[in-house]
């Protein structure tokens, strides 16, 4: 009989109220400019984090999940009888989290050469609910009695076909985090341009620029419809509740179905996109 557990990081943006039976979420540590440190999900709410972003001069720093924290979690799960552990990480191109997980696995087997546990480390190649949603479904699959291999295959196929469209109503954070150049941000702010960005397999690309706040949501929805062959299955995310509500009702009206989920975007996206940003996660055709 299998006893399968999943470890992921708080970049997954799985809602705090989601009741998952087989998933452990390790929070990123966030350090603000006043030197305070918080573990995401556990010490600080997203809303409080957005308030910090609103007033900060220097962007908070986020630390990856360390090898030691993974090692401790693996040991605890094995002690509790886990036969299979699947570790899902945020896109490894943007964080040392994946490498830390791989290292923790190696060290665990060096120290426990006779252990029969299976440990699989998966780079989601993604951000936010683009890996959080598949992890939520994998939790259900564990409850339904699927094998570890079925769950790993499912996760890999989901990660291969999720994308996120994102836009920000203020360019301050994209400029500070280097997502867009200072020159582009300056020109954009001068002309009232807002970037529409696609996050795909770890790559972030500006696919369109629109003029004025009113054009952001229609452009996001238009890009979404062009990029998916499954417009009924999507999730929206936001760092600003008012814009989130606007996006929700515009999507429902335009697509005929509400999103599967509406979530607050956590620190991994919010730090780079800012506290006035919105996004849509969806599936591509592959």
Which ranges hold each PLM region?
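Glycine-rich phosphate- or other oxyanion-binding loops that anchor nucleotides, phosphorylated ligands
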Residues: 55-106, 148, 152
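N-terminal glycine-rich anion-binding loop in soluble enzyme alpha/beta folds
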Residues: 4-64, 69
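Aromatic side chains
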Residues: 38, 49-50, 70, 98, ...
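Intrinsically disordered, low-complexity regions enriched in small/polar residues
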Residues: 40, 44, 51, 72, ...
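Short acidic, glycine/Ser/Thr-rich loop/turn "cap" segments at secondary-structure junctions
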Residues: 86-89, 119-123
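Hydrophobic residues in alpha-helical segments
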Residues: 53-54, 78, 142, 175
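Short alpha-helical interface patches
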Residues: 46-54, 72-74, 157, 214, ...
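Mixed-charge interfacial surface used for oligomerization/domain docking
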Residues: 2-5, 11-19, 23-33, 94-97, ...
């Amino acid at each position: 009989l299998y006893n399968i557990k999943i470890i992921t990081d708080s970049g997954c943006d799985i809602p705090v109220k989601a009741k998952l039976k087989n998933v452990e979420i390790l929070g990123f540590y966030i350090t603000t400019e006043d030197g305070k440190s918080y573990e995401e999900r556990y010490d600080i709410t997203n809303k409080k984090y957005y308030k910090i972003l609103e007033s900060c001069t220097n962007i908070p720093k986020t630390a990856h999940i360390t090898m030691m924290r993974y090692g401790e979690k693996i040991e605890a799960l094995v002690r509790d009888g886990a036969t299979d552990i699947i570790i899902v990480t945020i896109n490894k191109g943007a964080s040392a989290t994946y490498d830390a997980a791989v290292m923790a696995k190696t060290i665990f087997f060096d120290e426990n050469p006779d252990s029969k546990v299976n440990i699989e480390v998966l780079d989601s190649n993604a951000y936010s609910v683009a890996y959080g949603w598949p992890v939520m479904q994998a939790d259900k699959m564990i409850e339904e009695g699927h094998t570890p291999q079925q769950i790993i295959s499912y996760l890999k196929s989901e990660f291969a076909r999720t994308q996120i469209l994102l836009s920000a109503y203020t360019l301050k954070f994209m400029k500070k985090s280097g997502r867009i150049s200072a020159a582009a941000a300056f020109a954009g702010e001068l002309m009232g341009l807002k970037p529409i960005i696609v996050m795909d397999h770890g790559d972030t690309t500006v696919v369109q620029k629109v003029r004025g706040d009113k054009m952001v949501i229609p452009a996001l929805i238009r890009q979404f419809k062009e990029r998916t062959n499954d417009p009924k299955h999507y999730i929206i995310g936001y760092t600003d509740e008012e814009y989130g509500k606007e996006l929700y009702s515009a999507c429902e009206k335009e697509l005929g179905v509400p999103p599967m989920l509406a979530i607050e975007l956590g620190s991994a996206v919010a730090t780079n996109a800012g506290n006035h940003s919105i996004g849509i996660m969806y599936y591509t055709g592959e």
